[in-house]
């Protein structure tokens, strides 16, 4: 109930207007009761941030069935776009809002959920390079470029900026996927380059 109420207030009024008292009022608890479960609102939003990553992980569960690493990378990008467009509030907490990262700094711990997603991307990019599917390069740099590309698309879309390029709302996600296709096509190795048959 506490997390549901927090997300409702966050969506309707923004992070700055969410307080423990307002959360308590919404669910008819006393603020003291809320504090029994969460130290502060940053901790509440950190928990929501974790739930968002769990949702994204569920979307990516079938990636292991895709043997071709380039197709897997492409599907990973599509899933990212679809997740961000379907869950803008969670996306905000996971990749845009400062508060969850502030909580990580306060706790002195690693960004476990984010690191897991990033490592999966790096592993897939490295496999693509090793098997000749994409141009050889620094896998860290290529992974950062791929992530930055899809993150930029989602951020522009959920903040209402992408309409400058795509006025029709129903075309936003299809155009984002076309942009992803362009990226993948441009990092793909040319047919002339040798490719490990085992990767086909």
Regions found by a protein language model. Name each.
Residues 1, 9-43, 47:
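Helix-turn-helix
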Residues 2-10, 18, 52, 56, ...:
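Short hydrophobic clusters on alpha-helical segments that form packing/core surfaces
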Residues 41, 48, 52, 56, ...:
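Hydrophobic/aromatic residues within well-ordered alpha-helical segments
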Residues 44-52, 94, 102:
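Alpha-helical DNA-contacting segments of helix-turn-helix folds
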Residues 50-75, 105-106, 111-117, 122-130:
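Amphipathic alpha-helical linker/stalk segments
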Residues 61-89, 142-146, 189, 193-200:
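Hydrophobic alpha-helical connector segments
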Residues 86-123, 141, 169-170:
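Short secondary-structure transition hinges
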Residues 107, 130-179, 191-200:
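Hydrophobic/aromatic-rich alpha-helical bundle segments in the mid-to-C-terminal region
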């Amino acid at each position: 109930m506490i997390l549901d109420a927090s997300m409702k207030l966050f969506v309707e009024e923004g992070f700055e207007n969410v307080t423990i008292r307002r959360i308590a009022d919404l669910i008819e608890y006393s603020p003291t009761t809320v504090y029994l479960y969460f130290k502060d609102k940053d901790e509440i939003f950190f928990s929501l941030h974790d739930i968002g990553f769990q949702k994204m992980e569920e979307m990516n569960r079938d990636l292991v069935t895709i043997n071709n690493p380039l197709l897997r990378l492409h599907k990973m990008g599509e899933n990212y776009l679809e997740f961000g467009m379907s869950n803008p509030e969670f996306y905000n907490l996971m990749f845009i809002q400062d508060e969850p990262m502030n909580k990580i700094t306060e706790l002195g711990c690693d960004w476990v959920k984010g690191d897991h997603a990033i490592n999966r991307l790096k592993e897939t990019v490295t496999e693509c390079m090793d098997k000749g599917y994409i141009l050889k390069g620094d896998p860290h740099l290529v992974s950062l470029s791929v992530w930055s590309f899809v993150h930029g698309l989602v951020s522009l879309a959920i903040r209402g900026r992408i309409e400058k390029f795509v006025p029709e709302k129903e075309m936003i996600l299809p155009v984002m996927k076309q942009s992803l296709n362009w990226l993948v096509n441009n990092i793909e190795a040319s047919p002339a380059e040798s490719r490990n048959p085992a990767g086909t």
